A protein has these predicted regions:
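Short, solvent-exposed loop/turn segments at secondary-structure junctions
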Residues: 15-17, 53-55, 142, 171-173, ...
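Internal, conserved structured core segments that host functional sites
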Residues: 93-147
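Surface-exposed, charge/polar-rich loops and edge strands
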Residues: 95-98, 102, 132-133, 143, ...
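N-terminal short beta-loop-beta anion/metal-coordinating cradle
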Residues: 1-5, 67, 113-121
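A short aromatic-anchored loop/beta-hairpin motif
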Residues: 2-100, 107
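Beta-strand elements within well-structured catalytic alpha/beta cores of enzymes
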Residues: 7-12, 45-50, 137, 158-171, ...
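Conserved phosphate-coordination/catalytic loops
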Residues: 24-28, 87, 145-149, 222-225
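Long, well-ordered alpha-helical scaffolding segments within enzyme catalytic domains
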Residues: 28-39, 146-161
Length: 267
């Protein structure tokens, strides 16, 4: 089995910029992400797969100084003045592109697109000094679980020592559920799917992952699956059960974080 050189972390990133605005419904999530950042070895770079970028083919940001993409609507003016002036890492981006192509995955460089809120919101919480370079990799538009497991596996041959691979999505993403906290049908679906998902991740059961829509509460927890797909990229890259699972309340719903720690290098 290939040695896992990177720390791999899937997070539920919350609602738009709300985690950065002191929203009460995100306090537990902010504390959780800060705890995770303090627990992990400080990375020299972060590779992010965010739910908020889909393209065909897969694209990789190559800018040395990426801008921010305020890809949310209807929030207070300060939401659009958030700054996170991290650098990019063009050399790492080139290595990712080379590795993906070598593994038969069609991928292109993206020199212009900024980092979306699935990147800068959790990064600002975890690494507020913006002194760790970020590279963002898109999801493919078809959102195929099989493909995104393979996308993660395609990176297994890279030396990602001291790199954090971050899957930024949400283990529950039904907007109606967030706006209807008393909807017991959706609340029950949330709890059922979280239990099923933890079991699937604990077994690294890729066949089950590909059938997530048939899981208890699956379809109601994710009317569209883009927020779940980054988890499958992480699971594909790790190829084994998680090391740590953290569940927190976000806006009245259970939301999960999954962590796979890098392997110790042999002496």
């Amino acid at each position: 089995m290939t040695m896992q050189t990177a720390d791999i972390l899937f997070i539920s990133h919350g609602g738009g910029p709300l985690p950065l605005l002191g929203d009460v419904g995100h306090q537990a999530l902010v504390s959780c992400l800060q705890q995770l950042a303090s627990q992990l070895n400080r990375p020299k770079a972060v590779i992010v797969f965010s739910a908020h970028w889909e393209s065909t083919p897969v694209r990789v940001t190559t800018s040395a100084n990426p801008s921010l993409l305020y890809d949310y609507y209807g929030f207070p003016p300060e939401s659009y003045a958030i700054q996170y002036p991290c650098q990019g890492e063009p050399e790492l981006a080139a290595q990712i592109l080379s590795q993906l192509k070598a593994q038969g995955i069609d991928a292109d460089a993206e020199p212009e697109r900024g980092l979306d809120h699935g990147v800068f919101v959790p990064m600002k919480i975890m690494y507020p000094d913006a002194d760790i370079p970020c590279v963002q990799v898109s999801l493919r538009q078809d959102l195929s679980v099989e493909f995104h497991l393979a996308l993660g596996k395609a990176l297994q041959g890279m030396d990602l020592s001291d790199v954090l691979v971050l899957g930024s999505g949400f283990s529950f993403h039904n907007m109606r559920g967030f706006f209807e906290p008393g909807n017991q049908t959706i609340n029950q679906a949330n709890h059922a799917f979280e239990q099923w998902l933890e079991a699937a991740m604990a077994e690294a059961n890729e066949e089950a992952m590909q059938r997530w829509q048939q899981a208890p509460g699956g379809a109601l927890s994710h009317p569209r699956e883009e927020h779940l797909i980054p988890l499958f990229v992480c699971a594909g890259l790790a190829g084994r059960p998680y090391d740590q699972h953290l569940s927190v309340d976000v806006l009245g719903k259970q939301a999960s974080q999954y962590l796979w720690l890098a392997s110790e290098a042999p002496n």
